[in-house]
Amino acid sequence: MDDISGRQTLPRINRLLEHVGNPQDSLSILHIAGTNGKETVSKFLTSILQHPGQQRQRVLIGRYTTSSLLNAKEEDISINNEAISLIEYSRIEKELIEADSSLKLQCNNLELLTSVALVYFAKKNCQWCIIETGLAGKQDPGSIIAGQSRVCCAITNVGISDEAFLCKFLSQITESSTNKAIFLLDGSNDEFVRNTITKRCHDVGCPLEITDPSLRDYNVHTDTWGTLEVRLPYSEEEYQIFNLRVAIAVLDFLSKEKKVCISKDQLSQGLISVDWPRSLHRLDYCYESTSGKKIALLLDNANNAKAARNLACHLRTTYGDTPLTFVIAITTGKKVSPLLDPLIRPQDYVIVTRFGSVVGMPWIQSLEPVNLLAFIKNRYTRNVNMQPDLQSVWTFLETSGLKTIVPVIVCGSLYICKELLRLHNCHLPV
């Protein structure tokens, strides 16, 4: 399991934000937690909440995420889908770094990024702030918001390999029982997750709603607008209906609490116009700067069991029994079998490697490739090779004569995908 709880100390970010006036206390926060689906939920909420009712002026909706595959760090912070300018980001960051230094806190990059977001949203007087948070409970910097600032917390799908985080995440439920915050849980979660969260909410008297887990239709049932019919944009990603039900449950709650005024027509229009995120990223990866050599890749984090099953479903639908080539690195502590069982078959070829150090997150380490190689060879396929780093992977593919008629699939960790994208941008001609 990725151990972040022992190495991130939330009091540091508390003290830093207190030094700059506790900007989070002036905000109305919608927390989005979970393993899969946070981006879909937060994007849809941003799209709808910008134009409530008949108001002439757009409402300002802040959005903060650290999970996007393609974003630079300043793009993780946006208002009405417009990213903070690099100049503004750098100015706020500089002020916080100076405060951090004077207080001798030694905040890490994630804590500083979270602080920049909260300061920026407060400065711009955002009416709503959508904060995507991890599952590390009190130890997650995105979970600093407490008390009346947090209006509700939506919990998307929790991957099996992340269930151990629940014991930490549940601390948020205990704190939320003291105000009117509600928890909205994706009903498609495994029974263990549903039962665990339901029991904790019951024990502390915290309201909980669980969304419809069925796939018999793509309808969403609400108290405010009745039944809504949904058309999903990508047939291979039918699981998006679960994320959408969570997002609409948030809006339904806000409407019943008289915190927003949204018509059914507006909601229906939002279903059509929302910029749906996709988990799969196709890339003609430039792996050599001098020659501009490229290779077709398919990138997907697939860093938890549910995401791995979704990727496998797409691969089987698209490529059938065709042998596939995988490049895989996995974060130390993750359970490997739930990530690879759905994906790797005897006819596939696997190259195991590692990602480099993650700036500002020294607790994030890549699983040793030699251990991953032995696991894959014993369990899935004899067609497995080990390379010490990403650049060596492409040299091996070029010299080995291994040819594929479909894209090479890169998966297993968000960090290998981000490192690959960084290298790609460095290799592109100026």
Swiss-Prot record:
It catalyses: (6S)-5,6,7,8-tetrahydrofolyl-(gamma-L-Glu)(n) + L-glutamate + ATP = (6S)-5,6,7,8-tetrahydrofolyl-(gamma-L-Glu)(n+1) + ADP + phosphate + H(+). It is an enzyme of class 6 (ligase). Its EC number is 6.3.2.17. It comes from Saccharomyces cerevisiae (strain ATCC 204508 / S288c) (Baker's yeast). Conversion of folates to polyglutamate derivatives. The keyword ATP-binding applies. Coiled coil: none annotated. It comes from the Eukaryota. It is found in: Mitochondrion. Belongs to the folylpolyglutamate synthase family. ATP binds at residues 37-40, 300. The keyword ATP-binding applies. The gene is RMA1. GO terms for molecular function: acid-amino acid ligase activity; ATP binding; dihydrofolate synthase activity; metal ion binding; tetrahydrofolylpolyglutamate synthase activity. GO terms for biological process: folic acid-containing compound biosynthetic process; one-carbon metabolic process. NCBIfam families: folC (TIGR01499). PANTHER family: DIHYDROFOLATE SYNTHETASE-RELATED, FOLYLPOLYGLUTAMATE SYNTHASE-RELATED. Pathway: Cofactor biosynthesis; tetrahydrofolylpolyglutamate biosynthesis. This is Probable folylpolyglutamate synthase. GO terms for cellular component: cytoplasm; cytosol; mitochondrion. Its main location: mitochondrion. Gene3D superfamilies: Mur ligase, C-terminal domain, Mur-like, catalytic domain. Mg(2+) binds at residue 132. Keywords: ATP-binding, Ligase, Magnesium, Metal-binding, Mitochondrion, Nucleotide-binding, One-carbon metabolism.
